[in-house]
Curated annotation (Swiss-Prot):
Main location: membrane
Residue stretches making up the Protein kinase domain: 330-612
Family recorded in the similarity comment: Belongs to the protein kinase superfamily. Ser/Thr protein kinase family.
PROSITE patterns named among the record's database cross-references: LYSM, PROTEIN_KINASE_ATP, PROTEIN_KINASE_DOM, PROTEIN_KINASE_ST
Organism this protein belongs to: Physcomitrium patens (Spreading-leaved earth moss)
Reactions mediated catalytically: L-seryl-[protein] + ATP = O-phospho-L-seryl-[protein] + ADP + H(+); L-threonyl-[protein] + ATP = O-phospho-L-threonyl-[protein] + ADP + H(+)
Topology class, membrane: Single-pass membrane protein
Active site: D452 (proton acceptor)
Xref: InterPro entries: CERK1/LYK3-like, Kinase-like_dom_sf, LysM_dom, LysM_dom_sf, Prot_kinase_dom, Protein_kinase_ATP_BS, Ser-Thr/Tyr_kinase_cat_dom, Ser/Thr_kinase_AS
EC numbers for this chain: 2.7.11.1
Class in the EC hierarchy, top level: transferase
Name under which the protein is recorded: Chitin elicitor receptor kinase 1
C-alpha cells in the first residue's frame, strides 16, 4: 500500500508538470490573422535571418577595419558587394553592404555589436561617425547598461544595437533580405527606388511612412543577393499553417488533443521509470559490471563498503585502504593539487601511477556527473577515469598525467627550471583540447557540455599532448536555461553569466579564452593597472579586466597584426610565426563573440587548428634550420 501511495504521488506530480507545459504551449498558439495559425513570437521569423547594413565609406576606412567593427569577414563582404573588384583599393564615398546576423533578442530583431572605445572617442562620435547613425546614443546607453555616456574612456566596451528586418510573408513573401538604411536629408522615395532597384511601392509596404522621410530615421529596404536577385522570405516556418479559413483553428485543436493524449501517456511511463530509478538508487548494494581495461590494474578488488552509488560500468571500485596506502594516508607530501571542493593526491597501485581526487560527501552531484561522463566517454584527448571509492569520502581515480596543468606552464615562475611552452607545443595543445571538446559535443551518445573549460582543467602528458579534465560540472547537451550558475568567472559567456542560458557554445566561448591565454600567457581575469597619466593612486583605480577586453583594442585596430606582438607571451622570446598567432587570435575572437549564434562549433575550431598546426610545423622546421645554420650557437630558447 505504501509503495502504491508513493507511486500515485509521483505520477500526480509528473502529470501536473506535463499539463502545465501543455497549457503554456497551447496558450502560445494564437491567430494573428484569419486562417493563419502561428506559434506566438514577437519576431518574424523567431530564429532571425541574414541582414545588411548600408554603409558609406569615409576617409580612413578600409575593409579590414569594417570587418572588425561589424564582426564579419572579407569573403562575406565581397559576396554582397560584387562591385568591389579589389578589396584593397576601395575609395572613400563608396557605398557597400555589410552582412550581419539579424537576431531575435528580447522580442526585437537586432544585432548587438561590440565596440571598444579608442582615444578621442565620444558617444556621439561612435554613433554618428563610426556607425553612421545606424543606432542612437540612447540605444547604446541602454544596451551597454550605462547610465551616462558623456565621459567614455579608452578601452571601455560598448554594445552597439543595430535594428534589422527579415521581411514578412503576410506582406510580401517575395522579399527576404533587407538593408538597414539611414535616411539622408535629400532622400526621396523615388530616389531610393532608383538607387536600390526596387519598386517604390515595395519599399512603402515594408515601412510605416515613406511619404515624409525624416533624416536620420531608419528604414528597411529590400536588397539583392550576390546573384543579383531578391531572395524570398524563407525563415518563417516555425508553427505556420497557411490555410485561409478557420480550418486552421480546427486542425490546431485536434492536434492539441492528440498531443495531450500522447503527453499523458508519456507522463505515466516517465513517472513509473523515474520512480523505479529513484528506488533502485537508494538500494544499499553495488553491482560491479566491469573491471579496468588496463591489465595492470586487473587485480584490484571491488569494495565491500556497502556504498549507495549506482552501478558504474568499466570502472573499478577501490577500497579506502588501497587509496590510503597509495597516498601515505593522504599525506601533504603526496598532494599535487587543491581545488575549491577537492584535493588531488599522487599514488601508485599495481605499478600504475594514479591521480586520486578526494572530494567531500557534499559533492555528490559533481562526483556523479564526472563518474557518468568518464565511464561512458573515452577519447585520447580526455582524461581517463580508472576507478572510484565511496568510503569516508568520495574518490575518483584517474590516470596520472605527468606534466600537470596548462595554466601551471603558462604562468611558470622564472625560477622554474623547465623551459616555457614553445609555439608549436601551444598550437598542438589547442588542437588536442579542441578535439576533446568536439568529441563530447558531437560524437558521444548522449552528447555533453563541459561547463568549466579553463587552462587549469587541461592536462599535459609527458609529450605535452593535452587532455581535457574535470567533468564535475558536465551536463547533457540540452540547450535551455540552467538551474544555477557554475563555472569560473572570466570563462563564462554573457548569455550564461547573465541569464543562465546553456548550450555547447558555452564551452566554445571558454575555449576562446583559453586560446587568448595560450597566446598571451596571461590569466583570464586580472587587475588592470592605471595609466601613467592617471592622477588617482593605483589602489583607487585598479579594476578587474578580462582577457577578451585585453585583446579587443588590438583586434579592432586596422593595424592590429602589427600591434599584436605586445599581447604575445614574452616567454616565447619572439620565436613564433606572427601570421599563425594572428590567425589563432582571430579564431579566439570568433569563439568569444558576444552572441552565441555567431560563435563557431568546436568542429570548425578543430579544422582551423589542424590547418594552423600543419603550417606551424613547416614554420618550426624552417625556423630552427635557419637558426642552426648561423655561426653563433642558438640560445637556450632556440633549443626548444
Amino acid at each position: 500500500m505504501k509503495f502504491q501511495m508513493k507511486m500515485k504521488s509521483e505520477l500526480c506530480r509528473t502529470y501536473k508538470y506535463w499539463l502545465i507545459l501543455l497549457v503554456l504551449w497551447l496558450s502560445g498558439v494564437t491567430q494573428r490573422e484569419t486562417g493563419v495559425l502561428i506559434v506566438d513570437a514577437d519576431c518574424i521569423p523567431p530564429n532571425g535571418c541574414k541582414a545588411l547594413a548600408y554603409y558609406r565609406l569615409k576617409q580612413g576606412d578600409d575593409l579590414e577595419k569594417l570587418q572588425g567593427r561589424f564582426q564579419t569577414n572579407n569573403s562575406e563582404v565581397l559576396a554582397y558587394n560584387p562591385q568591389l573588384v579589389d578589396a584593397n583599393s576601395i575609395q572613400a564615398g563608396t557605398n557597400i553592404y555589410l552582412p550581419f546576423d539579424c537576431l531575435c533578442l528580447n522580442g526585437e530583431l537586432v544585432h548587438r555589436f561590440s565596440y571598444t572605445v579608442t582615444t578621442n572617442d565620444t558617444a556621439e562620435k561612435v554613433v554618428d561617425v563610426t556607425y553612421q547613425k545606424l543606432t542612437t546614443v540612447g540605444a547604446v546607453r541602454s544596451a551597454s547598461n550605462s547610465g551616462d555616456l558623456s565621459s567614455i574612456y579608452s578601452g571601455q566596451s560598448l554594445t552597439i544595437p543595430v535594428r534589422c528586418y527579415c521581411g514578412d510573408p503576410n506582406v510580401d513573401p517575395k522579399y527576404g533580405l533587407f538593408s538597414t538604411y539611414v535616411v539622408q536629408a535629400d532622400d526621396q522615395l523615388t530616389s531610393l527606388s532608383t538607387n536600390f532597384s526596387v519598386d517604390a511601392d515595395v519599399i512603402s509596404k515594408f515601412n510605416s511612412d515613406t511619404r515624409n522621410l525624416s533624416p536620420d530615421s531608419i528604414i528597411f529596404i529590400p536588397s539583392k543577393a550576390a546573384n543579383g536577385s531578391f531572395p524570398p522570405f524563407s525563415g518563417y516556418v516555425l508553427g505556420t499553417v497557411h490555410w485561409r479559413s478557420n480550418v486552421g483553428i480546427i486542425v490546431g485543436v485536434v492536434v492539441g488533443g492528440i498531443v495531450l493524449a500522447v503527453l499523458l501517456l508519456f507522463a505515466l511511463i516517465f513517472g513509473f521509470k523515474h520512480f523505479r530509478r529513484r528506488k533502485l538508487a537508494k538500494e544499499p548494494t553495488m553491482q560491479q559490471s566491469g573491471l579496468l581495461s588496463s591489465s595492470s590494474m586487473a587485480g584490484s578488488k571491488p569494495s565491500r563498503s556497502g556504498s549507495t552509488m549506482l552501478p558504474v560500468p568499466k570502472s573499478v571500485e577501490f577500497t579506502y585502504e588501497e587509496l590510503a596506502a597509495a597516498t601515505d594516508n593522504f599525506s601533504l607530501a603526496k598532494k599535487i593539487g587543491q581545488g575549491g571542493f577537492a584535493s588531488v593526491y599522487y599514488g601508485v597501485i599495481r605499478d600504475q601511477k594514479l591521480a586520486i581526487k578526494k572530494m567531500t560527501l557534499q559533492c555528490t552531484k559533481e562526483f556523479l556527473a564526472e563518474l557518468q561522463v568518464l565511464t561512458n566517454v573515452h577519447h585520447t584527448n580526455l582524461v581517463q577515469l580508472i576507478g572510484y571509492c565511496t568510503t569516508n569520502s568520495l574518490f575518483l581515480v584517474y590516470e596520472y598525467i605527468e606534466n600537470g596543468t596548462l595554466d601551471h606552464h603558462l604562468r611558470r615562475r622564472k625560477s622554474d627550471d623547465k623551459p616555457p611552452l614553445s609555439w608549436l607545443q601551444r598550437v598542438q595543445i589547442c588542437l588536442d583540447s579542441a578535439r576533446g571538446l568536439e568529441y563530447i559535443h558531437e560524437h558521444t551518445k548522449p552528447t555533453y557540455i563541459h561547463r568549466d573549460i579553463k587552462s587549469a582543467n587541461i592536462l599535459l602528458d609527458d609529450n605535452f599532448r593535452a587532455k581535457v579534465a574535470d567533468f564535475g560540472l558536465a551536463k547533457l547537451a540540452e540547450e535551455g536555461t540552467g538551474t544555477g550558475i557554475v563555472g569560473t568567472f572570466g570563462y563564462m559567456p554573457p548569455e550564461y553569466a547573465l541569464y543562465g542560458e546553456v548550450s555547447p557554445k558555452l564551452d566554445v566561448y571558454a575555449f576562446g579564452v583559453v586560446l587568448f591565454e595560450i597566446i598571451s600567457g596571461r590569466v583570464a581575469i586580472s587587475s588592470a593597472l592605471p595609466s601613467e597619466n592617471d592622477q588617482q593612486s593605483p589602489a583607487q583605480n585598479r579594476e578587474s579586466r578580462t582577457l577578451t577586453s585585453f585583446f579587443e583594442p588590438v583586434l579592432n585596430d586596422p593595424d592590429g597584426k602589427t600591434l599584436l606582438p605586445k599581447c604575445i607571451d614574452p616567454a616565447l622570446n619572439g620565436e613564433y610565426s606572427l601570421d599563425a598567432v594572428w590567425k589563432m587570435a582571430q579564431l579566439a575572437r570568433r569563439c568569444t563573440h558576444q552572441s552565441p549564434d555567431m560563435r563557431p562549433t568546436m568542429r570548425f575550431a578543430v579544422v582551423q587548428l589542424m590547418t594552423l598546426a600543419s603550417v606551424t610545423q613547416e614554420w618550426d622546421v624552417g625556423y630552427f634550420s635557419r637558426a642552426s645554420s648561423q655561426s653563433q650557437p642558438p640560445s637556450g630558447n632556440d633549443q626548444l
